[in-house]
Amino acid sequence: MNLARLISTVHNQKNSYMNGYLKALGLSHGQAIALKIIHEEECIKQDDLNKRLQIDKSAVTRILKTLEEKKLIVKTRCEDDKRNQHIVLTDEGKKLYPSIKQIVLQTANEMLEGIDENQQKQLEEILLKMKKNLEGKNE
């Protein structure tokens, strides 16, 4: 199996693994990661969330619409840019965060089982180089 395909396979397996646990919370992988980022930032502009998630803007819009319908987030217009919106967690969204964080940590621990700290560091360095090599190539 070539390296690019292997990276894609691991990514898909990780998402599938997480989705198994997130299903009990009524969330998808994308929704959970969006909630995690919003929690970490406390208040984030939708454009910044798009950049952090690194997925299609329309996919982010769908994720946010679903989270809003579930009353996990609220969106308000930015004073400095009426075209943009601030996104914050509701109390319900904040209550879910510890469970999401636990699932993310559990997934990382499962993925990295049997891989020592030096190997993890090497892998991180290689993946960051690969990411840097591709940044801006499609713009």
Spans of features found by a protein language model:
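N-terminal leader segment of winged-helix/HTH proteins
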Residues: M1-L25, L72
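Charged, amphipathic alpha-helical coiled-coil/dimerization segments
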Residues: N15, D47, K65-L128
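Residue-level detection of the helix-turn-helix DNA-binding "recognition helix"
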Residues: N19, K23, H39, Q54, ...
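Short alpha-helical "packing" element that flanks the helix-turn-helix/winged-helix DNA-binding module
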Residues: A34-L35
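Short capping segments at the starts of secondary-structure elements
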Residues: E41-K45
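The alpha-helix within a helix-turn-helix
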Residues: N50
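Helix-turn-helix DNA-binding motif, specifically the short coil turn and the N-cap/start of the second
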Residues: D56-A59
